[in-house]
């Protein structure tokens, strides 16, 4: 039995490709006129199993949309281009959007960009666990990390004549077994033996996904907000079996000692008690704490430095990936013990 993602809106694929590209061209997203052609703008290797950044630059036809939902191992960035208001009812488990390989889980991230009304759009995300997120966004660009273990609904208002939605995926892999079911508040926590002891050994990470802007790291014991001042993208060696247009976006596994994660990571505050994060004496981010259950956790705590070190060294300097963005009632994984 086939699974339905939503009521498929039939459209002329070539027409929407042209409009999509023209829109980005007019918005100075594309700087060269040669990209005005839809055919030149598409990667010829565009398939579900091909991790190509150019896939997300294409409008989707109904067949590809169906393939995306029925395929349980999705590593692509896909952008859905719609010309009408829409409502997504998603059951991520039923639709196989939750993909587990060992202790690795793919976390869906929903991006809403280029909405028509710009300064007025209100985006609503409601999970079937009773968590509801609403935000009136001035620039109408929105990013939400979705807990893959709950259903949710994504809506745009009637006044929105068109919107573009990017669905991408973050994958966090560690040698620590995660909690299989969401905790209260939709927080999924990776547990360490003792929060007060020095952590030995290695953390094995495989992170996929890409965002800029605000980063929230949440857990039931600790939460911080990082606002990136800049982002740095790595360029790996060119793999033979990957097309040239995708070579700089290839993900790979990295194993790094925990001590190396916090090496050269420093935290300081100015006279206004604003905290900043530094890596090798370069200011990387500004961050704050909120909803901190355990007041004993401070900016100097080793667990805090590990979380910040992961952002600095794995997600900014060495990889093109950042693990996710969320609002206070959704979640991103944080490497902290949970005693709830």
Curated annotation (Swiss-Prot):
UniProt-listed InterPro entries: Vaccinia_virus_B17
* Alphabetized Pfam families for the sequence: DUF1231
Q: Which domain of life is it from?
A: Viruses
Family affiliation? Belongs to the orthopoxvirus B17 protein family.
Q: What is this protein called?
A: Protein B17
Q: Which organism is it from?
A: Vaccinia virus (strain Western Reserve)
């Amino acid at each position: 039995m086939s699974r339905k993602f939503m009521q498929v809106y039939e459209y002329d694929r070539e027409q929407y490709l042209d409009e999509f590209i023209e829109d980005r061209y007019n918005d100075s997203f594309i700087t060269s006129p040669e990209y005005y052609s839809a055919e030149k703008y598409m990667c010829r290797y565009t398939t579900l199993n091909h991790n190509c950044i150019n896939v997300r630059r294409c409008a989707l036809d109904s067949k590809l949309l169906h393939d995306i939902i029925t395929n349980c191992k999705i590593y692509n960035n896909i952008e859905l281009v719609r010309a009408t208001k829409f409502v997504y009812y998603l059951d991520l488990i039923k639709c196989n959007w939750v993909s587990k390989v060992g202790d690795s889980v793919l976390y869906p991230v929903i991006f809403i960009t280029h909405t028509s009304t710009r300064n007025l759009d209100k985006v609503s995300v409601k999970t079937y666990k009773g968590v509801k997120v609403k935000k009136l966004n001035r620039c109408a660009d929105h990013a939400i990390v979705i807990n893959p273990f709950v259903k949710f609904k994504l809506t745009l208002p009637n006044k929105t004549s068109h919107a573009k939605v990017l669905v991408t995926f973050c994958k966090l892999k560690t040698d620590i077994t995660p909690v299989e079911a969401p905790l209260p508040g939709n927080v999924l926590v990776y547990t360490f033996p003792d929060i007060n002891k020095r952590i030995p050994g290695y953390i094995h990470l495989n992170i996929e996904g890409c965002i800029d802007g605000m980063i929230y790291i949440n857990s039931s014991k600790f939460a911080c907000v990082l606002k990136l001042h800049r982002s740095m993208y790595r360029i790996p060696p060119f793999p033979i079996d990957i097309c040239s247009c995708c070579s700089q976006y290839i993900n790979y596994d990295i194993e790094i000692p925990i001590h190396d994660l916090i090496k050269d990571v420093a935290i300081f505050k100015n006279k206004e008690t604003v905290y900043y994060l530094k890596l090798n004496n370069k200011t990387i981010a500004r961050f704050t704490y909120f909803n901190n259950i355990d007041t004993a956790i401070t900016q100097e705590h080793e667990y805090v430095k590990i979380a910040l070190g992961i952002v600095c060294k794995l997600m900014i300097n060495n990889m093109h990936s950042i693990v996710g963005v969320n609002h206070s009632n959704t979640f991103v994984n944080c490497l902290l013990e949970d005693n709830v």
